[in-house]
């Protein structure tokens, strides 16, 4: 579970993985991989109205990303989650896109 990877995050408490889930990008520094937590930013379907929202980063479906369409990383919803909730690795994003998402989180935090 490394920085820039796209994973499916289970949002409920069930261990069966049959509940609600969403895609997230891992932003945690890889040096912290020994911890059972990751800092993630959720992905939502891109809408043209997001262009004016600096906390929404457009994420195209680049090769090996696991994305099937254009998504938006919602930096306002940054959170730390247990690695046990990260159920399926979908792919990874280029460093350039990951850094754009991290910069948006920095703007949100101030």
Predicted features along the sequence, with ranges:
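Conserved functional hotspots at enzyme active or ligand-binding sites that engage polyanionic ligands
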Residues: 1-110
